[in-house]
């Protein structure tokens, strides 16, 4: 159905943004952390090497704490796992990221 395609488009058109940096969410599983192997690398000692995992399923993005020391906060609430919505504020250590629609809407 077209609804499924629409959800796929929504999932593929999201990004994380912080202080002038943007991170495309171009695959269905994204590791966030300080380690060099992280898909989104945040080189900050307040961020764990393997801090959180972003996954998308049926058009919904979920963030999961994967054993971080400082926790994952969504809109100020400490969570183990949470479904993300547009403009949610994600705090990992001292880093603050916004989950939003991509600013450069490229045609795919």
Question: Model-flagged regions — what are they?
Answer:
Residues 31, 41, 55, 60-62, ...:
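General beta-strand recognition
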Residues 1-43, 55, 104-108:
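Intrinsically disordered, low-complexity acidic Ser/Thr-rich regulatory segments
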Residues 67, 73-108:
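C-terminal boundary/linker segments immediately following FHA domains
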Residues 19-21, 38, 59-60, 70, ...:
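Short acidic/polar mixed-charge low-complexity motifs
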Residues 30, 45-48, 68:
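Loop/turn elements at beta-strand to alpha-helix junctions within RNA-recognition modules
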